[in-house]
Amino acid sequence: MYVRIVQDLIRELGKLPGIGPKSAQRITFFILQNPSFDIDRLSETLQSVRKQVQFCKVCGNFSEEDECVICSDPRRDRGVICVVEEPKDVVAIEKTREFSGLYHVLGGAISPIDGVGPDDLNIRQLLQRLADGTITEVVLATDPNMEGEATASYIARVISAMRIRVSKLASGLPVGSDLEYADEITLGRALEGRQYIN
């Protein structure tokens, strides 16, 4: 149907999340039919991202430095940490402009079916951050699905003895969805109306 190299490109693009065979084919045809599209720049940018972006040593968010721009910003409220599953959740919450504290990225959620337990997440690092006594509140902003709820419950239970207020996003987020798909207004209201667990 297509020459081998075109099939290879479609197959490789199709490995990206959210890109099915039709989208991969459309992107491939766009690249082939638009000689003004700077494919070299795209390639260089992809390679630069792979080489230069790392995880923040403090919170686990994406960063070009050892500390991300949020952790190194002196204007952030250092008494509140919002716990999220993935860096994309940080982006979603930042878009609301409702949260001015720090973040902690777990790197996923507890999922026994997928073989992911608490030790596979950045929970130990969270507990180390909480141990210094400067944090007064932890906002649990995990996805409103079974794995997210299990993760939030586990973290709330583990830190319950630390005398730190624990809150959870208010309802209003669709159950079973991901934070990244929530609109800014809904997510902002969920932050504003967060419910305290302890």
From Swiss-Prot:
<dbReference type="InterPro" id="IPR023627">
    <property type="entry name" value="Rcmb_RecR"/>
</dbReference>
<protein>
    <recommendedName>
        <fullName>Recombination protein RecR</fullName>
    </recommendedName>
</protein>
<dbReference type="GO" id="GO:0003677">
    <property type="term" value="F:DNA binding"/>
</dbReference>
<keyword id="KW-0227">DNA damage</keyword>
<dbReference type="Pfam" id="PF02132">
    <property type="entry name" value="RecR_ZnF"/>
</dbReference>
<dbReference type="InterPro" id="IPR006171">
    <property type="entry name" value="TOPRIM_dom"/>
</dbReference>
<dbReference type="GO" id="GO:0006281">
    <property type="term" value="P:DNA repair"/>
</dbReference>
<keyword id="KW-0234">DNA repair</keyword>
<keyword id="KW-0863">Zinc-finger</keyword>
<dbReference type="InterPro" id="IPR015967">
    <property type="entry name" value="Rcmb_RecR_Znf"/>
</dbReference>
<keyword id="KW-0479">Metal-binding</keyword>
<dbReference type="GO" id="GO:0006310">
    <property type="term" value="P:DNA recombination"/>
</dbReference>
<comment type="function">
    <text>May play a role in DNA repair. It seems to be involved in an RecBC-independent recombinational process of DNA repair. It may act with RecF and RecO.</text>
</comment>
<feature type="domain" description="Toprim">
    <location>
        <begin position="79"/>
        <end position="174"/>
    </location>
</feature>
<keyword id="KW-0862">Zinc</keyword>
<dbReference type="Pfam" id="PF21175">
    <property type="entry name" value="RecR_C"/>
</dbReference>
<dbReference type="GO" id="GO:0008270">
    <property type="term" value="F:zinc ion binding"/>
</dbReference>
<dbReference type="InterPro" id="IPR034137">
    <property type="entry name" value="TOPRIM_RecR"/>
</dbReference>
<dbReference type="InterPro" id="IPR000093">
    <property type="entry name" value="DNA_Rcmb_RecR"/>
</dbReference>
<dbReference type="Pfam" id="PF21176">
    <property type="entry name" value="RecR_HhH"/>
</dbReference>
<comment type="similarity">
    <text>Belongs to the RecR family.</text>
</comment>
<keyword id="KW-0233">DNA recombination</keyword>
<dbReference type="Pfam" id="PF13662">
    <property type="entry name" value="Toprim_4"/>
</dbReference>
<feature type="zinc finger region" description="C4-type">
    <location>
        <begin position="56"/>
        <end position="71"/>
    </location>
</feature>
